[in-house]
């Protein structure tokens, strides 16, 4: 995905409501398969890009693209609001504390600038919007760069390890597709 100072927003459900420390993981390498596998990318390097600013919000219970949330926390990277990202780089954000009440979503927002930024076709996985700075505000976008993992520091009863990813599950390998391939094998 190429972006010239584009601000993206995506709403994510949280596993547990309340105040927690969150961290966000990023990979600037693409491993992806689409459709029947004839279109796939293995170890494809992302481009150089800049994270100009990132913020998380209590996203509320509604998906209003142009809402101005009141509860927010700035996301930083090694103490800085901005980050230059190199091809194939992997990194975590610093921890950020946010209170997301029961039934609310975590709203991820960031402004990025650069070329070949790894992005995902979100379709019906989450509400995703982009503001290109053209005065039109946030408009729906199907292809959006987002963190690869949202981590939450909370007490757990047990740890579970899973193997596989969206491809092995057949999730979003075609538009609105959920084939659950692992269950079919």
Where are these regions (language model features)?
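N-terminal secretory targeting modules
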Residues: 1-163, 168-175
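Phosphate-binding active sites in nucleotide-utilizing proteins
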Residues: 158, 176-185
């Amino acid at each position: 995905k190429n972006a010239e100072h584009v601000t993206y927003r995506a709403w994510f459900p949280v596993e547990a409501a309340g105040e927690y420390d969150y961290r966000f993981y990023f990979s600037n390498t693409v491993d992806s398969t689409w459709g029947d596998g004839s279109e796939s990318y293995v170890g494809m390097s992302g481009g150089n890009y800049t994270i100009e600013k990132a913020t998380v919000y209590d996203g509320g219970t509604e998906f209003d693209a142009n809402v101005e949330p009141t509860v927010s926390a700035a996301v930083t990277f090694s103490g800085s609001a901005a980050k230059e990202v190199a091809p194939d780089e992997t990194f975590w954000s610093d921890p950020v504390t946010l209170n997301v009440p029961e039934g609310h979503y975590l709203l991820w927002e960031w402004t990025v600038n650069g070329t070949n930024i790894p992005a995902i076709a979100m379709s019906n996985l989450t509400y995703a919007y982009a503001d290109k700075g053209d005065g039109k505000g946030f408009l729906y976008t199907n292809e959006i760069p987002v963190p690869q993992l949202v981590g939450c520091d909370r007490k757990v009863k047990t740890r579970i390890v899973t193997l596989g990813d969206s491809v092995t599950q057949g999730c979003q390998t075609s538009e609105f597709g959920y084939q659950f391939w692992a269950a079919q094998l």
